């Protein structure tokens, strides 16, 4: 599958989360609240959150933004600050993020 014409300007962000034992239900609820809001942001091309079938405390995020400015805007939204930073991150045992560009 070929990358879209404007893909070289896009920013791809991946994240891996591992939830602290006992916080699974709380984090799942927060992510269900957060996801539709993130998907509606103007600079978001794609935003998916996946839960590991074998290890349900682990999540994989796949996010595609129109560019670095759109990612910066995403991090300044009220839903990111309140739900992710304020509520979900404190319930994590581990959080890793990486940024990529299409080639």
Language-model regions, residue ranges each:
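An amphipathic, aromatic/His-enriched active-site/gating alpha helix that lines ligand/cofactor pockets
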Residues: 39-45, 64-98
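Short, well-ordered beta-strand segments in beta-rich or mixed alpha/beta enzyme
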Residues: 11-18, 48-75
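Generic alpha-helical hydrophobic packing signal
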Residues: 8-10, 32, 62-65, 86-87
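Glycine-rich beta-strand-turn "strand-cap" elements at beta-sheet edges
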Residues: 1-9, 49-55, 84-103
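Alpha-helical structural elements of signaling/regulatory helical domains
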Residues: 22-23, 53, 80
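N-terminal first-folded block
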Residues: 7-39
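Residue-level detector of intrinsically disordered, flexible termini
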Residues: 1-2, 14, 37, 69
